[in-house]
A protein has these predicted regions:
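Interaction/scaffold regions that mediate signaling and macromolecular assembly across diverse proteins
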Residues: 15-239
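Sterically constrained small-residue positions within well-ordered secondary structures
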Residues: 7-9, 138
Length: 239
């Protein structure tokens, strides 16, 4: 399904024409703090406090009541769906009372990415649908530095919402921050070891050469070859 067709399917009458993301922005400011888990520096989330905050219900309601088909520009679509993914990943953790890893919310035959995560415009969605059917087809590999699946090895959850007017700067900053982290982004000079994200989604970066160019652009230095990948730590990025 094309991106246009997918987004067109979200047009539902009588829904809000603009997303109210102020509750999500307040949640990110209140409940995301820098810390360390398993020796990895990252932004940690206080899931208990987030779930008890009345703004969480308000943020979920804003998604459910918003007609995503009204999003006009590429930047509006990209910012909205990154915010939606990150909020719904947190919702999965809270709803399923996950303590160890977000993957614990899934089952033997249905991984967590394919279970219902929440509602957008009155329609039930999964994290898999948002990532693979909406965000990845938009063609910007920096999404992989911005969407956060509630795990230690994920890029850091940004303590603010993504907004169309600042999206380029925000995504560049996310890429630079992630690649500056030697425990989960990249380590080495010349021959480098990378996040497993660059292995899983190599094609999104334009193949191996595109990965090397991306790393060189956002981290700098002489990047010649990928020597391997970090083990992915799926432990919850919790406070």
């Amino acid at each position: 399904m094309s991106l246009g067709a997918c987004l067109a399917g979200w047009a539902v009458p009588a829904l809000a024409a603009l997303p109210d993301l102020a509750p999500l922005d307040r949640l990110l400011h209140r409940h995301v703090r820098a810390g360390e888990i398993h020796g990895v520096a990252l932004n940690r989330v206080d899931y208990a406090a987030w779930g008890a905050d009345s703004d969480h219900a308000a943020a979920l309601a804003a998604l459910e009541n918003f007609d995503a088909g009204k999003l006009a520009s590429h930047q509006e679509q990209l910012a909205f769906w990154i915010n939606a993914y990150n909020l719904l990943a947190i919702q999965v953790v809270i709803e399923h009372r996950t303590q160890g890893s977000i993957r614990d919310a899934g089952g033997l035959f249905t991984p967590v990415w394919k279970i219902p995560a929440g509602r957008v415009g009155g329609r039930e969605v999964t994290l898999d649908q948002i990532e693979h059917r909406i965000l990845r087809p938009m063609g910007d590999p920096r999404i992989h530095m911005a969407i956060v699946c509630a795990s230690v090895s994920c890029p850091d959850l940004r303590p603010e919402i993504y907004v169309p007017e600042q999206l380029e700067q925000q995504l560049d900053d996310q890429a630079q921050t992630f690649l500056a982290n030697p425990k989960k982004g990249v380590v080495g000079d010349g021959n480098v070891r990378l996040s497993r994200i660059f292995d899983w989604f190599e094609d999104d970066f334009g193949g191996r050469a595109g990965v090397l160019a991306f790393v060189a652009r956002y981290r700098g230095g002489n990047v010649r070859r990928v020597d391997g990948y970090f083990d992915y730590d799926w432990a919850l990025n919790r406070q």
